[in-house]
Amino acid sequence: MSGLFVSFEGVDGVGKTTQVERLRAYLEAQGRTVVVTREPGGTVLGKAIRQLLLHGVDGGAVDIAPRAEALLFAADRAQHVAETIRPALERGEVVITDRYLDSSLAYQAGGRELTPEEIRSLSMWATNNLLPDRTYLLDMDPALSHNRLEHAEDRMESAGSDFQSRTRQAFLDLAAAEPNRFHVIDASQSIEQVWSAIEADIQTLLRDNVADVDTVMARSGASTGAVTMGGVR
């Protein structure tokens, strides 16, 4: 794949949607084709699953068992990768997703107290081992981010302060375990300060991505040349 895959993570209210749109505009201004998507709900199937996950069955408050919840997220993600993410990457496009598998690891393994090994194994199977090139973790105290919410709470957002605190810590633990993929940004800063940190990092990431593609093409050309010369001989 020659595309670029970027995900945004963090507890609710940290400003992911705002920064996703800033990044989209920035990349499109540079002539890149950008696909913006989200989890759950990035496909038609995903929208139906999102309704169940965030609002319950028929909008009711019946709780979903942790294992059932994890399987629903995995089903959404499997369809998301197959239908939207992987095809776009294969076309050489940039994919930006508002949440990906790290949300499952943080919310289900951290917040819901399932084991990280269970959730990671399920998520990697569902995505056929597809990980983002960069994950921006917008970090903020949930007590502060909660005050930013401008809509009625969904099932996840109303889970309580202890759940949100465990989820935040789970995100930070994930970032510490994969420092080459994660870029942690203090989301309590202004929108412009957060964007400046993302902009500086994405410039480096784009340069590295172009260099990697050039290397692959050079190797491919050398290999093709060797075959041609062999045929002449």
From Swiss-Prot:
Signal peptide: none annotated. InterPro entries: P-loop_NTPase (IPR027417), Thymidylate_kin-like_dom (IPR039430), Thymidylate_kin_CS (IPR018095), Thymidylate_kinase (IPR018094). Keywords: ATP-binding, Kinase, Nucleotide biosynthesis, Nucleotide-binding, Transferase. Its EC number is 2.7.4.9. ATP binds at G10, V11, D12, G13, V14, G15, K16, T17. It is an enzyme of class 2 (transferase). SUPFAM superfamilies: P-loop containing nucleoside triphosphate hydrolases (SSF52540). GO terms for molecular function: ATP binding; dTMP kinase activity. The keyword Chloroplast does not apply. One of its GO terms (biological process) is dTTP biosynthetic process. It catalyses: dTMP + ATP = dTDP + ADP. GO terms for cellular component: cytosol. Gene3D superfamilies: P-loop containing nucleotide triphosphate hydrolases. It comes from the Bacteria. Phosphorylation of dTMP to form dTDP in both de novo and salvage pathways of dTTP synthesis. Belongs to the thymidylate kinase family. This is Thymidylate kinase. It comes from Bifidobacterium longum subsp. infantis (strain ATCC 15697 / DSM 20088 / JCM 1222 / NCTC 11817 / S12).
